[in-house]
Amino acid sequence: MLKRSKFETTQSQIMHRAEDLISAASNRYRITVQVANRAKRRRYEEFESAEDAMMKPVLRAIIEMSDELTQPEIIGEI
């Protein structure tokens, strides 16, 4: 029996996004550290706001960073 994900993104989509991030980066170590730092920051933000996180911080960081890579208008200038 397969366990269904609560999210619209599947494991294969997340792996594809992670591969895109690594291939676009000039330094694999640096992008890995950036993903880890963003996940750590998001984890503490969610902990302080007492929200019930449905998605693990690392997965959320990979999705956010890959979206920023593929859709630069998300970042935009304020």
Swiss-Prot record:
<dbReference type="GO" id="GO:0006351">
    <property type="term" value="P:DNA-templated transcription"/>
</dbReference>
<keyword id="KW-0808">Transferase</keyword>
<keyword id="KW-0548">Nucleotidyltransferase</keyword>
<dbReference type="GO" id="GO:0003677">
    <property type="term" value="F:DNA binding"/>
</dbReference>
<dbReference type="InterPro" id="IPR006110">
    <property type="entry name" value="Pol_omega/Rpo6/RPB6"/>
</dbReference>
<comment type="function">
    <text>Promotes RNA polymerase assembly. Latches the N- and C-terminal regions of the beta' subunit thereby facilitating its interaction with the beta and alpha subunits.</text>
</comment>
<dbReference type="GO" id="GO:0000428">
    <property type="term" value="C:DNA-directed RNA polymerase complex"/>
</dbReference>
<comment type="similarity">
    <text>Belongs to the RNA polymerase subunit omega family.</text>
</comment>
<keyword id="KW-0240">DNA-directed RNA polymerase</keyword>
<dbReference type="InterPro" id="IPR003716">
    <property type="entry name" value="DNA-dir_RNA_pol_omega"/>
</dbReference>
<protein>
    <recommendedName>
        <fullName>DNA-directed RNA polymerase subunit omega</fullName>
        <ecNumber>2.7.7.6</ecNumber>
    </recommendedName>
</protein>
<keyword id="KW-0804">Transcription</keyword>
<dbReference type="GO" id="GO:0003899">
    <property type="term" value="F:DNA-directed RNA polymerase activity"/>
</dbReference>
<comment type="subunit">
    <text>In cyanobacteria the RNAP catalytic core is composed of 2 alpha, 1 beta, 1 beta', 1 gamma and 1 omega subunit. When a sigma factor is associated with the core the holoenzyme is formed, which can initiate transcription.</text>
</comment>
<dbReference type="Pfam" id="PF01192">
    <property type="entry name" value="RNA_pol_Rpb6"/>
</dbReference>
<dbReference type="InterPro" id="IPR036161">
    <property type="entry name" value="RPB6/omega-like_sf"/>
</dbReference>
